[in-house]
Curated annotation (Swiss-Prot):
Belongs to the YbaB/EbfC family. It is found in: Cytoplasm, Nucleoid. Residues 99-108 have a biased composition (Pro residues). It comes from the Bacteria. Binds to DNA and alters its conformation. May be involved in regulation of gene expression, nucleoid organization and DNA protection. Residues 87-108 are annotated as: Disordered. This is Nucleoid-associated protein Bxeno_A2072. Its main location: cytoplasm. Keywords: Cytoplasm, DNA-binding. InterPro entries: YbaB-like_sf (IPR036894), YbaB/EbfC (IPR004401). Homodimer. Pfam families: YbaB_DNA_bd. GO terms for cellular component: bacterial nucleoid; cytosol. It comes from Paraburkholderia xenovorans (strain LB400).
Amino acid sequence: MMKGQLAGLMKQAQQMQENMKKMQEQLALIEVEGQSGAGLVKVTMTCKNDVRRVSIDPSLLADDKDMLEDLVAAAFNDAVRKAEATAQEKMGGMTSGLPLPPGFKLPF
């Protein structure tokens, strides 16, 4: 490989690293909401999986504790899936053209 090609690859890698850092910062600001029980339980989190809010409809507080725990878990899982999908969508443009294996998830 010639020096010019190597320098070009290094510059491209550095630019991608800077872009990834910016995208990571943006993902920390994007919020998604997961729901369960027809919206009676909601979990709001960032695309970096930081939970911001948990909302439980007061009508559930008198109900079965086990059911409420299941609804909270389901809402959390829904939020995680939405955060992952949003992150993949946002990162997709940055990784197009890279020979990444199928199912490879970014950010790392």
